[in-house]
Amino acid sequence: MKTVSQLIDMKQKQTKISMVTAYDFPSAKQVEAAGIDMILVGDSLGMTVLGYESTVQVTLADMIHHGRAVRRGAPNTFVVVDMPIGAVGISMTQDLNHALKLYQETSANAIKAEGAHITPFIEKATAIGIPVVAHLGLTPQSVGVMGYKLQGATKEAAEQLILDAKNVEQAGAVALVLEAIPNDLAEEISKHLTIPVIGIGAGKGTDGQVLVYHDMLNYGVEHKAKFVKQFADFSVGVDGLKQYDQEVKSGAFPSEEYTYKKKIMNEVNNND
């Protein structure tokens, strides 16, 4: 399992970091078998596996449930679990209680929290021993206000993102996720931070990349963002399900090959 210091060492050696967002035991098991460096249990699970319209409906209980499953599937991978909306920003005492509960009950290596406003939370969480990954740029929990669009696209916005990135690092963040920002801006931020910067829709100049398991494998998704590359096609599973339906209806399944050979009814009838 990678450690924070090893991830920083990868950045210093210019070895790119791979990260995949996964939500359950079997996907986490596959991600670990593939040798991926990090797993993010993202609150995007709300739309991807729970069928919600957005991340707004995702609860702390949801994140703990899925975080535990991922840890069981990937016991030797660096796992980061999202703080869902409402888990940060109520009061510092509540925020830290939520963070501690998530961190302890999922056995995660770090938690992730969105936005530039959380620097005081990062400082306090770090002080009590909870590693925090920051998330800037497009932050899904704020799409109701910001919308799904490129962030940092003006001079002022870019300068603010650079400042925000420096602030979360200074507050103690162990890594930073940058989402949907211009690639040259992401590269500039990556160069000026000592912590690893993981990009999603932020070009190749970051220290690593993260994509969602379901997006990159075309597993049950209808719409994919511009920055998503499909590396395999799990949608072919629908063909298998159709064949199963046909064989059940025709009586072709189960054949003798899939049936136990043991016969018992003669013995049952002889007892009468």
UniProtKB/Swiss-Prot annotation:
Cellular-component GO terms for this entry: cytoplasm
Cofactor(s) for this UniProt protein: Mg(2+)
InterPro entries per the UniProt record, alphabetical: Pantoate_hydroxy_MeTrfase, Pyrv/PenolPyrv_kinase-like_dom, Pyrv_kinase-like_dom_sf
Catalytic function, reaction form: 3-methyl-2-oxobutanoate + (6R)-5,10-methylene-5,6,7,8-tetrahydrofolate + H2O = 2-dehydropantoate + (6S)-5,6,7,8-tetrahydrofolate
Active site: 179
GO molecular function, one term: 3-methyl-2-oxobutanoate hydroxymethyltransferase activity
Protein name in UniProt: 3-methyl-2-oxobutanoate hydroxymethyltransferase
Record keyword Plastid present: no
HAMAP family in alphabetical order: PanB (MF_00156)
Residues where Mg(2+) binds: 43, 82, 114
Species of origin: Staphylococcus aureus (strain bovine RF122 / ET3-1)
